[in-house]
Amino acid sequence: MNLRLELTRFLNLCFALASAFMFWKGLSIVTNSHSPIVVVLSGSMEPAFQRGDILFLWNRNELNKVGDVVVYEVDNKEIPIVHRVLREHVDETSGKQLLLTKGDNNAGNDIPLYAKRKIYLHKEKDIVGTVKGYIPQLGYITIWISENKYAKMGLMGLIALSALLSNE
């Protein structure tokens, strides 16, 4: 085993991982969103967005309008929610924008999804970003990998095997 070759492979892997991380962080800074790309996980926004669509977010707009599709996070829930702004207003005391949302495919608004005793989302605190573009169905790959433990193990095995067999 050539130590220099193995060290070069390891450093190339570290460089690739660091580059991907820097790209993600750079995109986060440009979009002002800690998660600038998300995958739709449910059918609550059909027909506008299907399960598996990849959404690109932007969070530099000052105010959201009724009809905007936003991604928001709720306290104590890990998965962000993609829904449309149903109603908006500015709180007179704080000057902050408050939003009420609803999934296009849902019967009622999202108040039951919000934290206890909360009837509006705070733009600055709860909104991850506004949807500015999407790629249909490409996110199914991530859904399939996350929901299928054998797919995870197979992918990890494939990565390990390719690292072991590479002759560069």
Curated annotation (Swiss-Prot):
GO terms for molecular function: serine-type endopeptidase activity. Residues 31-168 are lumenal. CDD domains: Peptidase_S24_S26. Component of the signal peptidase complex (SPC) composed of a catalytic subunit SEC11 and three accessory subunits SPC1, SPC2 and SPC3. The complex induces a local thinning of the ER membrane which is used to measure the length of the signal peptide (SP) h-region of protein substrates. This ensures the selectivity of the complex towards h-regions shorter than 18-20 amino acids. SPC associates with the translocon complex. Belongs to the peptidase S26B family. One of its GO terms (cellular component) is signal peptidase complex. The chain crosses the membrane at residues 13-30. One of its GO terms (biological process) is signal peptide processing. This is Signal peptidase complex catalytic subunit SEC11. It catalyses: Cleavage of hydrophobic, N-terminal signal or leader sequences from secreted and periplasmic proteins. The active site is at 44 (charge relay system), 83 (charge relay system), 110 (charge relay system). The keyword Cell inner membrane does not apply. Keywords: Endoplasmic reticulum, Hydrolase, Membrane, Protease, Signal-anchor, Transmembrane, Transmembrane helix. Its main location: endoplasmic reticulum. It is a single-pass type II membrane protein. Residues 1-12 are cytoplasmic. Residues 154-165 are annotated as: C-terminal short (CTS) helix. The C-terminal short (CTS) helix is essential for catalytic activity. It may be accommodated as a transmembrane helix in the thinned membrane environment of the complex, similarly to the signal peptide in the complex substrates. Its EC number is 3.4.21.89. Catalytic component of the signal peptidase complex (SPC) which catalyzes the cleavage of N-terminal signal sequences from nascent proteins as they are translocated into the lumen of the endoplasmic reticulum. Specifically cleaves N-terminal signal peptides that contain a hydrophobic alpha-helix (h-region) shorter than 18-20 amino acids. It is found in: Endoplasmic reticulum membrane. It comes from the Eukaryota. It is an enzyme of class 3 (hydrolase). PANTHER family: SIGNAL PEPTIDASE COMPLEX CATALYTIC SUBUNIT SEC11.
